Amino acid sequence: MSNVVLIVYDPRMISKYLGQKLHMGLVADDIIKPTAEIAQQIFANFVRLVLNVSESSLTTLPLSANCDYDPELHKKSIPIIILFQCMKAFIKDNSGNKLDLTMCDLVTPAKHEHRFRKLTSFLVDFLKLHELATPAFNEISEEFSDRKFEMEKIREELLEAEKKKNDLLAKQSIRKRHEHELINEQSNAKAELKNVVNEYTETRQINEELDKQKEEAILHIQALEKEMLTGKKTIEHLNEEVLTSPEQLKQEMEERKRHIEELRDCLESSKKGLQAKLEAREICINSEKNVPVIIEKIHQWTEVREVIIDLIDVESENLRKLKEMEEQLDFMMKEMETAQKRLVEQSETHEQLRIEHTQKSEERQRRIEEITEQIANLKTSQPDVSQEIAKKKQELLALKNAHSETISQITNSCQDAVAKFAKLNAMFKETQKVAFEKNTAAAREMERLKSSLTGRLLSDYTFGSSTIDAGENTENCDPQPNDSSFSVFK
């Protein structure tokens, strides 16, 4: 802005152009010999119509500055101060520091006619530039809005594509994991099937051996029956013969009787052994029938075991996330405490500045009253001393300007402090809300995991006592669920 060229226009041209653009009935005399009302009206209309500042913003002090003052006393001064601050910043920013607005330009513009003409010429220049640049600016703004809309649309499409990509990757990982699980289940099933086939082969061999033993026992029983018939026939034959030696015959009969008793005991033991082998054969047949059910239950237990392992992994991950969230919450609480301490320190600093400002304001007010009293005394007692009166007025205006500058600085610092506090408060509330939601979600997930993991493993099949031999059952093959509650947290 250092290459700004200031042009001073003719008063008639200035009055005509400003009158058209600012909707005012101006004449050349209003620019040559301006009054305070005309100057304030020109700047106020410029701020409202060109800079688009609302009427309420020109009459109301911002934020905390709008307190601790008498509205009736400052009814006229507040709009002038706000208008002065707005136009001063505008002229300083756009004139390359070649022009500067003072309070005298608003209160007593007639004393500096050439300066007021420069200011109005600057406003005319800006209005011309504004009139030329507005169509191009609107066109660029529309094009920028269209491009921005297109960029937003493209960004949404990219986000949607990224989301679809992530979903596909997640589905792919789930599918691969499911394939690995199926492969593991297939390998386990093959191993179980191999074991069952081996058991079936062993059972078949045992059945064949039992059949052989049964046939041998039947042959042995037939042989015993033949011997019994032979013994009976021998006894009958001996009864028919003449007893030549009764003692010898009696002894032979006793021996035959003992032999028959031994054969009978052997027959009973053979029958019992055969009955036990038949029962073992029935048990093997029933076990062969129950092999598919056992395989199915093994598969179910394998799936339940995988689900339990997955739930344990999910629980560990949730516990880790919960620990991280607690650490983040502690960190944010520490940051909030630090911010509160800083806020308290800033409040104390602001309070100290306010006290100093109050003291300085009282001192300035007292000085203003003294100068006003001196001016009144000079007017009544010494009317010829106009130079000293003007000097006192200049001092009074300087004090007022310094007071206005101090008020604006304090207002800006208060606005910054309030904005920082609002930002910190919003950040703390948002962090607290997110932490509470995450903590609640983690607690719910923990309860859900506990409720899902502490339940029974359902089973529809149980072995009966008639299908398993108590003498050969050395391992606990009963798949019936235990009454004790299962829990991974024990």
From Swiss-Prot:
Pfam families associated with the record: Nuf2 (PF03800)
- Entry superkingdom: Eukaryota
Gene Ontology CC terms: kinetochore; microtubule; Ndc80 complex; nucleus
Example GO molecular function: structural molecule activity
The record's InterPro entries line, in alphabetical order, gives: Kinetochore_Nuf2_N, Nuf2_N_sf
Q: Where is this region: Disordered?
A: 346-365, 468-490
Coiled-coil parts of chain: 146-280, 310-407
GO biological-process terms attached to the record: attachment of mitotic spindle microtubules to kinetochore; attachment of spindle microtubules to kinetochore; cell division; kinetochore organization; meiotic chromosome segregation; mitotic sister chromatid segregation; mitotic spindle organization; reproductive process
Q: Which UniProt keywords apply?
A: Cell cycle, Cell division, Centromere, Chromosome, Coiled coil, Kinetochore, Meiosis, Mitosis, Nucleus
Q: What Gene3D superfamilies does this protein map onto?
A: Ncd80 complex, Nuf2 subunit (1.10.418.60)
Where in or outside the cell? Nucleus; Chromosome, Centromere, Kinetochore
Its biological purpose is as follows: Acts as a component of the essential kinetochore-associated NDC80 complex, which is required for chromosome segregation in mitosis and meiosis and spindle checkpoint activity. The ndc-80 complex synergistically enhances the affinity of the ska-1 complex for microtubules and may allow the ndc-80 complex to track depolymerizing microtubules.
What PANTHER family does the annotation carry?
Answer: KINETOCHORE PROTEIN NUF2 (PTHR21650:SF2), MEMBRALIN/KINETOCHORE PROTEIN NUF2 (PTHR21650)
Which family is this protein grouped under? Belongs to the NUF2 family.
Q: How does the record describe its quaternary structure?
A: Component of the NDC80 complex, which is composed of at least ndc-80 and him-10. The NDC80 complex interacts with knl-1.
- Protein name, please? Kinetochore protein Nuf2 homolog
Q: Source species, please?
A: Caenorhabditis elegans
Upper taxonomic classification of the species? Eukaryota, Metazoa, Ecdysozoa, Nematoda, Chromadorea
Report which gene this protein is encoded by.
him-10
